[in-house]
Amino acid sequence: MKPGVLKHWWNSSLTELKKQSTCMASFDLWVAAGKPKSGPIYVSKNADKLKYKNAIKKSKASMESCISNELHESLVYKEPVQFWKTWKSKVCAQSKNKTLLEGIDNDVAATEAFRNYFSEVCTPNDQNFNVCKQKEFNDAFREYKSKYAYNSMNCWMVNAELVGLAVAKIEKGKAAGFDSLTLEHLTNCHPIIYSLLAKLFSLMLITSFVPPDFGKGITIPIPKDEKSVRMHKIENFRGITLSPILSKVFEHCLLIMFQKYLSTSDNQFAFKANTGCSNAIYVLRNVIDFYIEHDTTVNLGCLDISKAFDKLNYYVLFMKLMKRNMPCNVVEMLLKWYSLSYNCVRWGDVLSEPFRLLAGVRQGGVLSPTLFAVYVDDLLVKLNKFGCTMFGLSVGALMYADDIILLAPSIYELQKMILICCEELALLDLRLNLGKSVALRMGKSWKLNCCEIVTSETAIKWVTETRYLGVYLMSGPKFSCNYEKTKIKYYRASNAILAKLGKQENPTVTLHLLQTMVFPILSYALEALRLSKTNLVKLEHPWSRAFMKLFNTFDNLIVMQCQLFTGVLPVCHQYAIRAMAFYSNLKISTNSLCREIFLARGESDINELSLKYSMDRPNADFDTRYRAIVRKHFCDTVTIAVDLT
């Protein structure tokens, strides 16, 4: 019987017991006798009922033990795939409740409503602007083609090795698109397929041809707030698009071949290898600390672009690619590709009629994030002349995808930068989301009332707290974050895990789940922050609470011993390991902002951790040596604490 059904613990022995047992017969006899409250009939009925219930309890306990043992064995033999397969199939109950939509009661109507919504979203903000840019592009492209002959592409031939590299970059286990092909088809196919694909891709580049199926996608609406039990509005959904696997392979080939034409400013931290949110937060924290140390209040403007990826103008993008001298074959191929972009919406078992995407990058496309970064790169270039500077680096504007944060030493400078943003976004046919764009201050003058910061439309609110890349920045005399909301998310996730496990008592399994699924919530981006002892204590308490509940104790010394013998370190020591690993990567980072700021200011951060654990400087064998040093330090701490008691 499937684990998702109501009585997954039921087995054939219980069925036989139910048939052969006198439980039902004694119950019927008791009912026929008028349901007496005493006497031999009443005693017989209760005895049979108890026997039957005990058999059910035994079956339930056996099933829970079996699941727990399977999970434990998967951990012991280091089979993470099997572990999560067992967890999802036998522990996580699959919800049978359909997502309810406001004013819609059937899948056909829902699919049509989503189709209309997504087709409207993927249209230009200004149709006249789009027509004007289309004419401008057509004129520019005719001149561009006359300068760059098509035979210049003969040197850009795709080979089987490049196709293999592209296939290796794609994640496994993703859903198939219209063609029903998945990555597993390519990884298990005959090697000659790679040669055939290489010839196909080469011909596509030379002739600027794109197969029509490369432009097809299936959009699946996902609610932005999945935990809400209320009826959802259509506007509260975002689309996840499934693209053909062969188009993804081709896009990876394009990324590898034409990377030099797609480079962007180091102030853009998204869509780059070995660079992420932690790097952006690290640079932000150091810039603010640097200015506060020099008695200057930093003014921050957190700007959000409304539906940035869905409103990208194709013709502006192609003209930007031409300015970068992208081969004309590639530009024309992208033009044809985007003109063939059609999506269908799938809701339940219903598939909508296709609709054309008139604006926005292709959802689910491998090239899409990089093309968007190219699209907004000129904005960062213009802002480089304004705002904060540090060691000769322009750090006045930092960007992660479509999230912009401006840093200025004065309100006047911040106002000037915001107006520049508005002007540049108008040239891109993009608009600010004024409801999500805010400003705040950090430094000694953070409490002073300030004049309004205005955009081309309205004023931006001054706030005391805002969310940036998953961390909650707080206005104050120094750089600080609010961890209370992080702790709330952590408690919610940990309670969900413990509720799923129920009475299954296996600390190894529970700790593995908490460490892999819940602890990342609590420790998100900590390596980029310089945590005080107070902040570490605040974060340590919820992590210790999990051990208190699991091992049924409130003694901190016992909790430390449990952490030692289970191999799960406290937050402060895990923070040290993550921070030192992060610093060792910053030294060789390809991002000039991260690398130069670390070389100029990272010495104190490293010295603090090195002194605490008597470490040497970070080097290549960090993982094997530094982790052992931190664990030994924790072991010595626990040993001393035990001896003192």
Task: Go through each PLM region and give its residues.
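Non-catalytic, peripheral interaction segments enriched in hydrophobic/basic residues
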Residues: 1-4, 10, 55, 64-66, ...
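Arg/Lys-enriched, amphipathic patches
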Residues: 1-108, 112, 116, 120-122
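Surface-exposed loop/turn segments and immediately adjacent short secondary-structure elements
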Residues: 80-235, 241, 245, 249, ...
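Short, conserved micro-motifs composed of acidic
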Residues: 153, 349, 430-465
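Conserved catalytic palm subdomain of right-hand nucleotidyl-transferase polymerases, strongest
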Residues: 172-181, 219, 232-242, 279-322
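Active-site palm subdomain of RNA-directed nucleic acid polymerases
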Residues: 254-269, 371-407
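Catalytic palm subdomain of template-directed nucleic-acid polymerases
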Residues: 307-324, 399-426, 443-444, 475-477
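Acidic catalytic cores of enzymes that act on phosphate-bearing nucleotides/polynucleotides
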Residues: 555, 560-645
